[in-house]
Amino acid sequence: LVLLLTSIASHEGMLRNALLWLAVIAVAAGKAALGHAADAGIASAAIGMHTLHVLVTSVWGGLALSAGLAVLPALDTSTARGVLIRTAGQVSSVSLVAVVFVLLTGAFNAARGSGGSFEAIDASTWGHVLVLKLALVALALVLGGLNRFSALPRLRRSASTVDAHTFNNVMYLEALAMLGVFVAA
């Protein structure tokens, strides 16, 4: 219904943007309400925190997937190198903010879901999936850190084709790791 109203609304209006954000939040809240957070009740802090977790994970994963699989490879020519460097910097900065929120909300969700017990993680399917997601997130964090602290500074200094390919290839691997996180979730 919200998406239908969005399509009817003006394409540049504030109402359309508000409706789109409402739809995004509704989808994230729906996803959160289908998971383990629903055990605490529909109007609970657990649902709110898990909704925020779904939203920020979508930002980080969406940026990684779109940048790694489509946008940055399309800018992989010497004539677009300046745009590639600016875009890579913006993707890295927004991703860093999203990652901080992913880790904070994820820690809250894990502590709440396990009751603070590592035994609950070890003895349950939910815990095994959580460990898999944590391993994939750790891989994505290592790849993102490699890009942010090694490949991107080199690319900014040299603007060379080799450094552009390095950044794009690592971003591609981060996108695959995030795809794995989404599949596991």
What are the residue ranges of the model-derived segments?
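Polytopic transmembrane helical bundles with strong interfacial aromatic enrichment
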Residues: 1-185
